[in-house]
């Protein structure tokens, strides 16, 4: 019989592998711990699917990362829900599943609305644009108008909003976006 001390040590070893960019070794150990429910009852137990997902994400195996982020998000209480949703959406985006990406970024926008957290609505806007949904692209990117100009991704999002307005022949709003960027 394997002791709890042994299982927790193996969990920490998997984390060490991850931090040393040895994602395959980390994933293998996390998966083994998950499959045998070795950490059941421990606070780290609920993080195992999240850790497996991140290993796949770092290995650029996006379909598997989506599966494991979903597994993590399906738990009743998750500590890193926003982060998991964003990475899941990123996986969809990278895999050119733009509609699914947009829907997942929109969940982040709805559940964690913060005007200065431009990333989810910038990415949602890009996703809608690549899915030929220009009105939804404008709607998502319009949130940047409430953000601080110092917010990360502010200039990129405002530029994309200006481009979206230009493509819709809305020259007045496009001008407003580009003017803000130029000032």
Where does each model-flagged region fall?
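Acidic, polar-rich low-complexity tracts and alpha-helical solenoid repeat scaffolds
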Residues: 1-183
């Amino acid at each position: 019989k394997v002791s709890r001390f042994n299982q927790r040590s193996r969990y920490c070893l998997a984390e060490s592998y991850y931090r040393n960019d040895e994602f395959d070794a980390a994933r293998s150990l996390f998966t083994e711990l998950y499959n045998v429910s070795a950490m059941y009852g421990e606070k780290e137990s609920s993080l195992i699917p999240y850790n497996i997902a991140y290993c796949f994400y770092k290995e650029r195996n996006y379909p598997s990362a989506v599966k494991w982020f979903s597994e993590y998000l399906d738990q009743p209480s998750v500590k890193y829900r926003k982060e998991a949703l964003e990475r899941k959406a990123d996986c969809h985006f990278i895999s050119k599943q733009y509609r699914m990406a947009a829907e997942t970024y929109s969940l982040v926008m709805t559940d964690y609305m913060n005007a200065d957290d431009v990333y989810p609505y910038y990415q949602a806007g890009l996703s809608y644009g690549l899915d030929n949904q220009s009105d939804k692209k404008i709607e998502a990117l319009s949130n940047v108008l409430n953000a601080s100009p110092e917010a990360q991704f502010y200039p990129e999002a405002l530029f994309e909003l200006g481009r979206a307005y230009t493509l819709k022949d809305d020259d007045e709003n496009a001008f407003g976006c580009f003017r803000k960027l130029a000032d």
